[in-house]
Swiss-Prot record:
Amino-acid positions noted as binding substrate in the UniProt annotation, renumbered to this chain: 94, 183, 230-234, 338-342
Keywords noted in UniProt: Aminoacyl-tRNA synthetase, ATP-binding, Cytoplasm, Ligase, Nucleotide-binding, Protein biosynthesis
Compartment(s): Cytoplasm
GO annotations of cellular component type: cytoplasm
Protein name: Glycine--tRNA ligase
Primary role: Catalyzes the attachment of glycine to tRNA(Gly).
Main location: cytoplasm
Keyword Ion transport applies: no
Keyword Cytoplasm in annotation: yes
Organism of this sequence: Chlorobaculum tepidum (strain ATCC 49652 / DSM 12025 / NBRC 103806 / TLS) (Chlorobium tepidum)
């Protein structure tokens, strides 16, 4: 993980935020390459969700909304995490995550009976008189230890609200309290009828959104995996009650394919996790998890949210959230199937999956084996000599390609060092302008993954890239 963090900063993917002032815990800035790659991820998601589905449209809701939205959604009253501290290091952990990870480890170790017993107690915790105490007892009785130190000296479990509260207006009083949204989903739900009417949508249909969310995470860390400011890519799919399971399975399959096929993630590093303990709004939930260097963690949640959200907003706003089927005249509040992907977590998963070290021509190299669609730079143009006609042709090729693709021009250092630089940032192709270019108009294409080379006509470079990026 340290190598990945070092590469990310050195090559301009991710910087610590406000670093000259010492930074701020779990806040990061995306650099030139990071912002390009993140945009590629978001564009690929947006195209997959909206362009390829005629019944899904987009929205960009406000970060701050009427605070009653968050009362209706349940966030004001219950958007809490159960936290427990390691007395040895004073580090704080989510109690539920410690238990869930312990159960998964027992399964992997073949200790099914022990895992089942802890799971039964864990699932019953929410219905006990003191859920916090119950979680604490499970941790103590199961001998669960702190992942970092192996210590089992724990504090009691306590609840922490995760919403950022701020004030709107000149006076800091309760009347001006607003919240930075902890999720993007509610901006979709409150616009259900606006979008449906404006877009003339009929159930089933979906609303997609990419946007920032904010959570006062007590447990931070693992680079950009868990931050207080992060970006979500969410889609809420509205269906007729009784059809949600069919829609859920369809989206579950499609979302897994997006990671493995569109983004090119290693299938063997992707895992399904079914939630047996469900959130108050859900009747079914799965996570897509990825094998990070620090463990197997969630990158996307797929949830059947029932009619909870629309019903709550109907109750608190006094406005009907019912849908009238024009064919059957049925009236109902739609059920919702949600796909919720973390853009930053996806970014980190892609970097983790792509990072490789190997030897080429007797020289060690670091390579990011990113899918060409995801790579921040699609091609590098490298003149063998930077002066004279060779440099001029290379510069012209770079200008031509830049009209359609993100391309870098590099004429500094030996050609071998330039290849290594491009390998390290994940550039899939290098176009080398050399002596043969001046004689017959061909250039060398060098492939990142294999270091193999071939020659193509310089006039075909744009066509070559377009084909490889399809």
């Amino acid at each position: 993980m340290n190598k990945l963090v070092s590469l990310a900063k050195r090559r301009g993917f991710i910087f610590p935020s406000s670093e000259i002032y010492g930074g701020l815990s779990s806040c990061f800035d995306y650099g030139p390459l990071g912002s390009e790659m993140k945009k590629n991820i978001k564009d690929l998601w947006w195209n997959a969700m909206t362009r390829r589905h005629q019944n899904i449209v987009g929205i960009d809701a406000s970060i701050m909304m009427n605070p009653t939205v968050w009362e209706a959604s349940g966030h004001v009253a219950s958007f809490n995490d159960p936290m427990i501290d390691d007395k040895t290091t004073k580090r704080r952990y989510r109690a539920d995550h410690l238990i869930e990870n312990h159960i998964e480890k027992l399964h992997r170790d073949g200790k099914e009976a022990e895992a089942a017993a802890i799971k039964v107690a864990y699932e019953a915790a929410g219905g006990t008189e003191d859920p916090n105490r119950t979680l604490y007892n499970i941790i103590i009785e199961a001998g669960i230890k702190a992942p970092d130190t192996g210590s089992a000296d724990w504090t009691e479990v306590r609840q922490f609200n995760l919403m950022f509260q701020c004030n709107m207006g000149a006076v800091a009083d309760s009347a001006g309290v607003v919240y930075l949204r902890p999720e993007t989903a509610q901006g979709i739900f409150v616009n259900f009828h606006n979008v449906r009417e404006a877009s003339r949508m009929k159930v089933p249909f979906g609303i997609a959104q990419i946007g920032k969310a904010f959570r006062n995470e007590i447990v931070k860390g693992n680079f950009i995996f868990r931050m207080v400011e992060f970006e979500q890519m969410e889609m809420q799919y509205f269906v007729k009650p009784g059809t949600q399971l069919e829609a859920f399975e369809a989206w579950r399959e499609e979302r897994f394919r997006w990671y493995s096929e569109t983004l090119g993630m290693s299938k063997e590093k992707l895992h399904w996790y079914k939630h047996d303990k469900l959130a108050h709004y859900a009747d079914l939930a799965y996570d897509i998890k990825f094998e990070f260097p620090f463990g197997i963690e969630e990158i996307e949640g797929i949830h059947s949210r029932t009619d909870f959200d629309l019903s709550q907003h109907q109750k608190y706003s006094g406005k009907s959230m019912e849908y009238i089927d024009q064919t059957t005249n049925e009236r109902y509040i739609p059920y919702v199937v949600e796909t919720s992907s973390g853009c930053d977590r996806t970014f980190l998963a892609l970097l983790s999956d792509a990072y490789q070290e190997d030897v080429v021509d007797g020289e060690p190299r670091v390579m990011l084996k990113l899918a060409p669609k995801v790579a921040p730079v699609k091609a590098a143009v490298l003149p063998l000599m930077k002066k004279g006609e060779m440099g001029e042709k290379a510069a012209q090729l770079c200008r031509d390609l830049s009209e359609s693709f993100m391309v870098q021009y590099d004429d500094a250092a030996s050609i071998g060092k330039r290849y290594r630089r491009q390998d390290e940032i994940g550039t899939p192709f290098c176009f080398t302008v050399d002596h043969d270019t001046l004689e017959n108009g061909t250039i060398t294409v060098r492939y990142r993954d294999t270091a193999a080379q071939e020659r193509i006509n310089m006039s075909k470079a744009a066509e070559f890239l377009a084909t490889k990026l399809m």
